């Protein structure tokens, strides 16, 4: 039999082929451990042989092989698969497939990997949780799989990476004819397959290796500070109110000694929802965003805009979807909103966003609201969810990723924040900068204590659910969490449904530090300037300066401990590449907490916390200091 190998810095793939056989294995070059693979497959349909036929790569003939890859061929069904190997980020091995077909067969799916797990004492795949904003199976899309001391997955947020019948593989649910998949008419290239390596086996070691791969792969590793209009006035905005709030925030932060904000964002409230017009300005913004763009430039920042693909979140949403049907777009009859998988709609909307970059100095989009549920219709240009729900979501996100690429061609430095009804796949970060946590409300209050305590309980409880219960593998630095929020439209329903939550200066300082401990690189300020005083502006500036200077540490922040919604001690630990660390410990109950907790790095911490007490400490450059100790 013939042998040929392809290697990256950390992984080597070896093929043995001949006499009608193909054997594949992967080797972790850091440890020398090897993993046998049964290979991938293509599942096709044709009138010749019925509805479905699996074509395993291991049954195909190795037609040719060279230093960059190899070609497989199945003469019986006219399918050829070219596999090219190169090095991905962080020394991982990347396999790129190119598929050709002699007939216009229906391609149900493409499966990559097929790593046999029998010889591994450790395996992990993301658990299936309850539906929150997307179906649980879809929420698990785009998560990696860990086997022994390697990780696998496809370079897309919508591959179904998992373990089935003793093999770890990545399935891409194409659910279309070959002619629909092959953009150039001749060949189809599904997302590439990734195999990466860790220094040892086990969840912590492989997760750390995977997230370091993600940090190299991701577009953004920056710390942004920007203002968003939503919680100040919500839909009730006009140019005068925007000018007033933008100016007040810019002046307040400047007076406090903070650098110019990166961006000022107009949220929902500018769109004409009452007429059959495609994302046009309403009468309040007759001149578009010319004035706002000039103002943000004067303030030293860029301009940001909210777009809600599904048509917003009001009673007018189904009405607007119906109005757009009159001009050639489609609506989702299940969710009674715009069909966000309609390829014409996605193309035109991302064209509109690219136009905003050119006309209004936009460098940030909050893209808010995709598919609440799948669309069953067959005439919208996407696979019908009645036939293939997974294929629907694959197609939807293919269209949006193409749209994101188009926007970046116009504005390479644009920041894309992908929010509601997306899912927390780290592979989104090849196209977007931030992803909404998608298991929480914009703001929430739960558990014991005053409004500050209940606010911290809510968000931190959702972090625990995301990272400990659902075990999502996603970098904290790229997670959008809708805070800090200190604004007149923010209410704690336990105490008042009409009066905003108000903090003392001391409470505000604690709140800001706790927000920063979560590690997000997007500090989008939902402030109402009239609720701020000089002390609060100074606090905001000081805490944001600290967070920006510590972003290289805080972006690795990880939750540990009890569920804050139920009371008890918990915290966050962030450890930078050089060992610098920041730790937060908090008691979310009204009783003294004698705690003993295991932190994410395996170290134990114990002590006593007073009711609702929070302590944040840092060790940087060998010096340890207490940042804040306070009670909420």
PLM regions and their residue ranges:
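An acidic-aromatic substrate-binding cleft motif
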Residues: 203-263, 267-272
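The substrate-binding groove and active-site-proximal loops of carbohydrate-active enzymes
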Residues: 226-243, 271-287, 331-350, 383-397, ...
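Glycine-rich, aromatic-flanked loop segments that form ligand/cofactor-binding clefts
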Residues: 206, 210, 260-266, 287-334, ...
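Active-site-adjacent "subsite" loops/lids of carbohydrate-active enzymes
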Residues: 223-224, 231-240, 302-360
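Polysaccharide-binding surfaces and accessory modules of carbohydrate-active proteins
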Residues: 4-6, 11, 25-168, 604-615
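Active-site-proximal substrate-binding groove within the catalytic cores of carbohydrate-active enzymes
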Residues: 26, 184-191, 396-616
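Aromatic- and acidic-residue-enriched segments that line the glycan-binding/catalytic groove
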Residues: 242-244, 276-285, 311-332, 378-383, ...
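Beta-strand-rich recognition/accessory modules
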Residues: 7, 102-113, 140-224, 500-505
């Amino acid at each position: 039999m013939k042998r040929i190998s392809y290697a990256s810095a950390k992984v080597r793939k070896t093929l043995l082929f001949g006499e009608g056989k193909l054997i594949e294995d992967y080797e972790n070059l850091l440890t020398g451990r090897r993993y046998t693979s049964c290979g991938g497959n293509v599942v096709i349909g044709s009138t010749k042989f019925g509805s479905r036929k699996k074509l395993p790569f291991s049954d195909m003939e190795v037609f040719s092989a060279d230093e960059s890859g190899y070609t497989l061929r199945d003469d019986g069904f006219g399918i050829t698969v070219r596999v090219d190997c190169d090095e991905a980020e962080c020394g991982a091995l990347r396999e790129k497939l190119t598929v050709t077909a002699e007939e216009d067969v229906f391609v149900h799916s493409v499966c990559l990997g097929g790593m046999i797990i029998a010889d591994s004492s450790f395996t992990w795949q993301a658990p299936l949780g309850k539906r929150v904003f997307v179906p649980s199976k879809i929420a698990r899309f785009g998560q990696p799989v860990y086997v022994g001391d390697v990780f696998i997955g496809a370079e897309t947020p919508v591959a179904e990476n998992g373990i089935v019948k003793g093999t770890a593989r990545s399935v891409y649910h194409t659910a279309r004819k070959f002619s629909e998949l092959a953009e150039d008419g001749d060949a189809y290239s599904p997302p590439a397959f990734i195999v990466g390596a860790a220094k040892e086996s086990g969840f912590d070691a492989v997760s750390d290796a995977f997230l370091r791969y993600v940090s190299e792969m991701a577009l953004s590793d920056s710390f942004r500070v920007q203002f968003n209009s939503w919680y100040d006035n919500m839909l009730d905005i006009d140019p005068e109110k925007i000018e007033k709030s933008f100016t007040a925030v810019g002046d307040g932060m400047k007076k406090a000694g903070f650098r110019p904000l990166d961006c000022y964002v107009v949220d929902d409230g500018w769109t004409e929802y009452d007429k059959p017009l495609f994302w046009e300005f309403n009468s309040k913004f007759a001149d578009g965003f010319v004035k706002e763009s000039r103002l943000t430039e004067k303030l030293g920042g860029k301009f940001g805009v909210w777009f809600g693909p599904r048509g917003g979140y009001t009673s007018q949403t189904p009405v607007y979807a119906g109005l757009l049907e009159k001009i050639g777009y489609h609506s989702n009859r299940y969710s009674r909103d715009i069909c966000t998988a309609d390829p014409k709609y996605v193309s035109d909307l991302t064209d509109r966003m690219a136009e905003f970059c050119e006309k209004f100095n936009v460098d940030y989009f909050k893209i808010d609201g995709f598919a609440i549920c799948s669309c069953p219709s067959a005439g919208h240009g996407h696979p019908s969810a009645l036939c293939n729900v997974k294929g629907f979501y694959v197609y939807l996100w293919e269209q949006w990723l193409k749209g994101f690429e188009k926007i970046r061609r116009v504005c390479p430095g644009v920041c894309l924040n992908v929010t509601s009804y997306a899912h927390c796949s780290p592979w989104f970060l090849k196209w977007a900068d931030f992803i909404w946590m998608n298991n929480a409300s914009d703001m929430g209050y739960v558990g014991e204590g005053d409004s500050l305590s209940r606010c911290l309980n809510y968000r931190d409880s959702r972090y625990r659910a995301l990272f400990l219960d659902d075990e999502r593998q996603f970098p904290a630095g790229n997670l959008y969490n809708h805070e800090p929020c200190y604004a007149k439209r923010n209410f704690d329903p336990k105490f008042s449904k009409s009066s905003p939550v108000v903090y003392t200066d001391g409470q505000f300082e604690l709140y800001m530090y706790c927000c920063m401990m979560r590690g997000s690189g997007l500090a989008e300020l939902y402030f109402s300037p009239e609720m701020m005083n000089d002390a609060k502006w100074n606090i905001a500036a000081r805490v944001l300066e600290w967070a920006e200077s510590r972003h290289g540490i805080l972006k690795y922040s990880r939750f540990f401990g009890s569920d804050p919604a139920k009371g008890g001690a918990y915290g966050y630990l962030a450890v930078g590449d050089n060992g610098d660390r920041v730790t937060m410990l908090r008691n979310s109950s009204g009783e003294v907490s004698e705690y003993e907790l295991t932190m994410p790095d395996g170290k134990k911490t114990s002590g006593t916390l007073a009711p609702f007490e929070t302590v944040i400490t840092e060790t940087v450059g060998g010096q340890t200091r207490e940042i804040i100790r306070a009670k909420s």
